[in-house]
């Protein structure tokens, strides 16, 4: 091969790298793939015992999770290919569909009840958890609302209050299922986006205080939530009843020490820790991979949040406000839910029933989170394709 051919090959490779960099945020993509891969490994490890005992197939949950990951990647690819203008124009319809699902699941005989909670709609092959769909649809709606009414949010109390009333209505429907954790995440997404849009601090503080007081009152006046709160404050007071799950989780995390007991060698997953492959996957990871594994996972979610806000800021500077708010919302949603899940596993927060995004077993969470990642990558693509950043076009919100 001549020197000219070698140089031409190098130039073609560099051009390919530039095109990939323009279309994909490689750092974000790699972190998501790392979480998906590690999640598959940990689901296989955490579920092998219970799958073998209850279903006769030690790889049952791994096979299903692998299928969910494939479907999730397909959902991400589809979301990535659809222009943001379509989602922005459909914001009102998406809001209506979210409310339709939240009401439909509460209709007697329609919603599927598991462990006393009616959160799912049966789709045949798997059950769809409507709260996961609602998180994505409300994030899209809020991004559209703030793009159209950003000035009203900053200057008028009514502009600030309108989306919060809609979110509060959705949160009440979630509490009727009940799904306290999803209601908290949904309200947090709304509050974070309103803050980033430039809502007045006194309005923001008033609403945060009101929401916190309402959630506290709800927790105190509901017996099973009060039991969870009591178990969270002192799980060792009743380690074989209300505090059982948390004490087993703490034992798992403590057993991991610095480097863990080894992949597949967890003891707590062997019928001691309930939901080991689902809500408490992080505890099994901590036991098997130790503090090193915990640090890697925390850094991956931290990087996801960093890149989400980086993509959002770039979009805002380029005048792509819908994409900016969408990126901020997805970043808050995924990272907040991840850190709540880890906090619950470590006994820092009461049990919420939230999955570890992109890692825990479950089809609904995987599909919706992957779709959100696809939208995030679409924001990056459209920002790059819009040309050089135009900083001067941004006015208002705190994200600028």
Curated annotation (Swiss-Prot):
Q: Which UniProt keywords apply?
A: Cell cycle, Cell division, Cell inner membrane, Cell membrane, Cell shape, Cell wall biogenesis/degradation, Glycosyltransferase, Membrane, Peptidoglycan synthesis, Transferase, Transmembrane, Transmembrane helix
Q: Which reaction does it catalyse?
A: [GlcNAc-(1->4)-Mur2Ac(oyl-L-Ala-gamma-D-Glu-L-Lys-D-Ala-D-Ala)](n)-di-trans,octa-cis-undecaprenyl diphosphate + beta-D-GlcNAc-(1->4)-Mur2Ac(oyl-L-Ala-gamma-D-Glu-L-Lys-D-Ala-D-Ala)-di-trans,octa-cis-undecaprenyl diphosphate = [GlcNAc-(1->4)-Mur2Ac(oyl-L-Ala-gamma-D-Glu-L-Lys-D-Ala-D-Ala)](n+1)-di-trans,octa-cis-undecaprenyl diphosphate + di-trans,octa-cis-undecaprenyl diphosphate + H(+)
Q: Which Gene Ontology MF annotations are present?
A: lipid-linked peptidoglycan transporter activity; peptidoglycan glycosyltransferase activity
Would the keyword Acetylation be found if you checked this record's keyword annotation?
A: no
Report the locations given in the UniProt record. Cell inner membrane
Q: What membrane topology does the annotation report for this chain?
A: Multi-pass membrane protein
Question: What sort of enzyme, by top EC class, is this?
Answer: transferase
Q: Does the keyword Disulfide bond apply?
A: no
GO process terms (BP)? cell wall organization; FtsZ-dependent cytokinesis; peptidoglycan biosynthetic process; regulation of cell shape
What's in the GO CC field? cell division site; plasma membrane
Q: In which pathway does it act?
A: Cell wall biogenesis; peptidoglycan biosynthesis
Transmembrane segments in this chain: where? 30-50, 65-84, 92-112, 123-143, 157-177, 179-199, 201-221, 247-267, 280-300, 321-341, 356-376
Family classification: Belongs to the SEDS family. FtsW subfamily.
Name the chain's protein.
Probable peptidoglycan glycosyltransferase FtsW
- Name of the gene this protein is made from: ftsW
